[in-house]
Swiss-Prot record:
Species per Swiss-Prot/TrEMBL record: Homo sapiens (Human)
MF GO annotations: cytokine activity; interleukin-1 receptor binding
Function: Cytokine that binds to and signals through the IL1RL2/IL-36R receptor which in turn activates NF-kappa-B and MAPK signaling pathways in target cells linked to a pro-inflammatory response. Part of the IL-36 signaling system that is thought to be present in epithelial barriers and to take part in local inflammatory response; similar to the IL-1 system with which it shares the coreceptor IL1RAP. Stimulates production of interleukin-6 and interleukin-8 in synovial fibrobasts, articular chondrocytes and mature adipocytes.
PANTHER family for this protein: INTERLEUKIN-1 FAMILY MEMBER (PTHR10078), INTERLEUKIN-36 BETA (PTHR10078:SF24)
Protein name: Interleukin-36 beta
UniProt record, GO biological process: cellular response to lipopolysaccharide; cytokine-mediated signaling pathway; immune response; inflammatory response; innate immune response; positive regulation of T cell differentiation
Keyword list, A-Z: Cytokine, Cytoplasm, Immunity, Inflammatory response, Innate immunity, Secreted
Length: 164
C-alpha cells in the first residue's frame, strides 16, 4: 500500500438518474436539478488511518468533506436513529493526518435512516433507491463518543428545496 496515495482525497460528484445533484444553499446541502447555472458540490473521500477508529467488521472509517468548504458529512444519533448531517470542521488542511481529530466518521457499509422530512432522490450509482426514509446501501454511522454527540449549533438537514 502507498500511504501517500491513501492520504490523497478521492473526489466524487453525486448525481442521480433524474439528474439531481447536491448543492450548498448556505450551510444546507440540498438536491437540485442539474443545469448550467447550478454548481454541484464535490465530495472528498479519505480513509481514516487512526487505529483508534478501526473496525475489522465494518472496515475503515472515511472522512467525507465538501471540496473547497469547511464542511464535512457525519452521522449523528437523532431520536435513536443515525442521521446524516453537515458539520463545520475547521480547516481542510488537517485532511489526511493520522488522526480523525474528534470527527465522527462514517463507515461505508449498510443502512442509514434519514429524516422523514427529507426526500433523497435516486442516487443510483451509490445503490440508493427511491425513498423517503432509507438509503438502501450507503453509510452506517460510526459509534458516537459522548463528547461528539452535541453538534446542535452546527447541524443542518439534507433534502429537497422546500421540503424541510
Amino acid at each position: 500500500m502507498n500511504p501517500q496515495r491513501e492520504a490523497a482525497p478521492k473526489s466524487y460528484a453525486i448525481r442521480d438518474s433524474r439528474q439531481m445533484v447536491w448543492v450548498l444553499s448556505g450551510n444546507s446541502l440540498i438536491a437540485a436539478p442539474l443545469s448550467r447555472s447550478i454548481k454541484p458540490v464535490t465530495l472528498h473521500l479519505i480513509a481514516c488511518r487512526d487505529t483508534e477508529f478501526s473496525d475489522k467488521e465494518k472496515g475503515n472509517m472515511v472522512y467525507l468533506g465538501i471540496k473547497g468548504k469547511d464542511l464535512c458529512l457525519f452521522c449523528a444519533e437523532i431520536q435513536g436513529k443515525p442521521t446524516l448531517q453537515l458539520k463545520l470542521q475547521g480547516s481542510q488542511d488537517n485532511i489526511g493526518k493520522d488522526t480523525c481529530w474528534k470527527l465522527v466518521g462514517i463507515h461505508t457499509c449498510i443502512n442509514l435512516d434519514v429524516r422523514e422530512s427529507c426526500f433523497m432522490g435516486t442516487l443510483d450509482q451509490w445503490g440508493i433507491g427511491v425513498g423517503r426514509k432509507k438509503w438502501k446501501s450507503s453509510f452506517q454511522h460510526h459509534h458516537l463518543r459522548k463528547k461528539d454527540k452535541d453538534f446542535s449549533s452546527m447541524r443542518t438537514n439534507i433534502g429537497m428545496p422546500g421540503r424541510m
